[in-house]
């Protein structure tokens, strides 16, 4: 290899052109940048990056090839009070690295220093960036582009979804390959979901605290390398990218979209006591929100917060998103703690990152879903994200649980949430699909645990049950824990059925947590982020097949109802919806606010949802005409009903006219 040529300032990262590699690194406050390359024995050779255009340092290494391991040492001031923490003793990952070798260990050499710099060299233990050459045959792949009105999202963990699946080859269980295997594709099609939303697949690390406890970060919300696939779920690190793309291609052929959960709000460098392995050492002041005392604004609860209003960090975030769309053909993103994306530092709908995404022809046309909060002041922003974002609707989640798992909730509040929370989302030209309705998600109780536990049971997490929310709106139906007498089990079943029907027959975009259609339980753990074990892995052999069939039938029913698939707001008299009482009369003002939980919802003038959320069997008079129960509510004997449905306690039934 020769000394570096000046090279080019773009594209960002390490780019192989067939003759060598061009390297670039953004740092506005650095005084010198060294490229460090490593041979197969770990010997290091350093080169100064000779070029600088604006704040991008660059150089070209002729003869360098894919597989080259590299990192950076960045020189500059150590001025913690001003937010500068340069320390050339620390080898740093390329923020644009497409592959990373090594894990982020809990090791003292990875600490950059607190008040004073730690000058011990960390190259022997630091993870290293790896140059790749990217060639992939997408064949005739095409994005499904499912309309929002027909979208049904299935949230799943790559490993947990398939690790225990007995029909998959042993060697691919819990991997990217399994996602596109015919067994899984057939299951997704049978269930009826249209989009697979994956918990983070970008390479992540386990926090030092978890490593000391013998636990791991299972969910993946501790990002280490935003452009690199997490290698643990691949046959080898070298094949991870192609195996993931193979899965995307197989899912697309079946008409199933792939949405990635992505973490742009913080990094695995954590607080000032965390490891220094990338952004902190490259340009701490630019990449993170820094307080006046030089410490971090911790609006994420993870120790640091990315400054997504800084122009170069906005560019970094957008390039990351474009990479996943253009290189991996993903169909959208769910943004973790997405209020951080709009901080300037206060939340603004016209924040720089939002404006950049909206202006991008690649990003503005994929599905964008916000988790519309963070833990900072003014962080709760449900309903306030600009188009084209959809948002997780926690109003729906809480209202559905409070309605069916006895709590105080008016019929009016329930109806509002059933109608895509128009009071929250009907603004700025947004459609009902902007409300992503959910009962459960990866964080919180599973659906089965919602009907089996009144209290969280997170002792296995090692925090003496202090972690996880206490606001679960759950009901154990008289006994804490799984199991119980037959009548209790039947009441729990009825509650699950009612909740699933509410989710899948409401206006908006439904999201189903993987395993809820099986009856999966985490035994009351509502924060299983560090449980990479049978607590979180779906047990397919113990799956409740009847519940799976029930769920699939609900999804099929949903796709038959124009009022739900049209993705337009319901207006009085438009034929989409009528709200009726138990006597088939329009609900009175008093019934909206003070009446019992008895109602009928007539959709598209031919589908009737009869609801009895009281604790008593109640007769419900159906509207004039002939009605027949439809699957999954129809039994073998399915007579026409012309007058009264005897609604069981906590019961719900759907009828079709004629």
Curated annotation (Swiss-Prot):
The record marks 443 as: Transition state stabilizer. Residues 459-484 are annotated as: Disordered. Pfam families: Alpha-amylase, CBM_48, GlgX_C. It catalyses: Hydrolysis of (1->6)-alpha-D-glucosidic linkages to branches with degrees of polymerization of three or four glucose residues in limit dextrin. The active site is at residues 336, 371. Belongs to the glycosyl hydrolase 13 family. PANTHER family: GLYCOGEN DEBRANCHING ENZYME. Removes maltotriose and maltotetraose chains that are attached by 1,6-alpha-linkage to the limit dextrin main chain, generating a debranched limit dextrin. This is Glycogen debranching enzyme. The lineage of its organism: Bacteria, Pseudomonadati, Pseudomonadota, Gammaproteobacteria, Enterobacterales. The gene is glgX.
């Amino acid at each position: 290899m020769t000394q570096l040529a000046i090279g080019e300032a773009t594209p960002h990262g390490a780019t192989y052109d067939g003759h060598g590699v061009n390297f670039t690194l953004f740092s506005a406050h650095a005084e010198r940048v060294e490229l460090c390359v490593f041979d197969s024995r770990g010997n290091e050779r350093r080169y100064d990056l000779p070029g600088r255009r604006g704040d991008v340092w660059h150089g070209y290494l002729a003869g360098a090839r894919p597989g080259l391991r590299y990192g950076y040492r960045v020189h500059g001031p150590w001025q913690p009070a001003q937010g500068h923490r340069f320390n050339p003793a620390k080898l740093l990952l390329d923020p644009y690295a497409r592959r990373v070798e090594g894990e982020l260990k809990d090791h003292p050499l990875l600490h950059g220093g607190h008040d004073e710099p730690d000058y011990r060299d960390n190259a022997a233990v630091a993870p290293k960036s790896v140059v790749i050459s990217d060639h992939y045959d997408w064949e005739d792949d095409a994005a499904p582009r499912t309309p929002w009105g027909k979208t049904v999202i299935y949230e799943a963990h790559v490993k947990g979804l398939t690790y225990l699946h007995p029909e998959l080859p042993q060697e691919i269980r819990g991997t990217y390959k399994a996602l596109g295997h015919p067994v899984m594709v057939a299951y997704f099609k049978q269930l009826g979901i249209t989009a697979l939303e994956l918990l983070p697949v970008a390479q992540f690390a386990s926090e030092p605290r978890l490593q000391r406890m013998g636990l791991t970060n299972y969910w993946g919300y501790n990002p280490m390398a935003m452009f690199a696939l997490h290698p643990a779920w691949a046959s080898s690190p070298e094949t991870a990218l192609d195996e993931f793309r193979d899965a995307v291609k197989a899912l697309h052929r079946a008409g199933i979209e792939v949405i990635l959960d992505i973490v742009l709000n913080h990094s695995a460098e954590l607080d000032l006591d965390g490891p220094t392995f990338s952004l902190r050492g490259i340009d701490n002041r630019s990449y993170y929100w820094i307080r006046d005392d030089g410490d971090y604004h911790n609006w994420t609860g993870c120790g640091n917060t990315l400054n997504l209003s800084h122009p170069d960090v906005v560019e970094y975030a957008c390039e990351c998103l474009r990479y996943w769309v253009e290189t991996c053909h993903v169909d959208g993103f769910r943004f973790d703690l997405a209020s951080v994306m709009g901080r300037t530092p206060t939340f603004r709908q016209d924040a720089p990152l939002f404006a950049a995404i909206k202006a991008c022809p690649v990003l503005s046309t994929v599905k964008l879903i916000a988790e519309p909060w963070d833990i900072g002041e003014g962080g709760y922003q449900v309903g306030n994200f600009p188009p084209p974002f959809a948002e997780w609707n926690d109003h729906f989640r809480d209202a559905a649980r409070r309605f069916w798992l006895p709590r105080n909730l008016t019929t009016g509040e329930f109806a509002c949430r059933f109608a895509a929370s128009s009071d929250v989302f009907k603004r700025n030209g947004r459609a009902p699909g902007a409300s992503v309705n959910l009962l459960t998600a990866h964080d919180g109780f599973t659906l089965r645990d919602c009907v089996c536990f009144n209290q969280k049971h997170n002792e296995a997490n090692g925090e003496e049950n202090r972690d996880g929310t206490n606001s679960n709106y759950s009901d154990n139906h008289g006994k804490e824990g799984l199991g119980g007498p037959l009548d209790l089990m039947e009441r729990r079943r009825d509650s699950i059925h009612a909740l699933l029907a509410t989710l899948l027959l409401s206006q908006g975009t439904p999201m189903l947590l993987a395993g809820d259609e099986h009856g999966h339980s985490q035994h009351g753990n509502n924060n299983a982020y560090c449980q990479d074990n049978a607590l979180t892995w779906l047990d397919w052999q113990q799956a409740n097949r009847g519940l799976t069939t029930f769920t699939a039938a609900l999804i099929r029913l949903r796709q038959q109802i124009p009022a739900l698939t049209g993705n337009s707001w319901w207006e009085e008299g438009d034929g989409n919806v009528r709200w009726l009482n138990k006597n088939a009369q329009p609900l009175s003002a008093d019934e909206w606010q003070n009446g019992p939980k008895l109602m009928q919802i007539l959709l598209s003038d031919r589908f009737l949802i009869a609801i009895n959320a009281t604790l008593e069997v109640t007769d419900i008079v159906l509207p004039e005409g002939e009605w027949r129960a439809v699957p999954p509510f129809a039994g073998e004997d399915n007579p026409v009903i012309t007058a009264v449905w005897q609604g069981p306690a906590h019961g719900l039934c759907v009828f079709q006219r004629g």
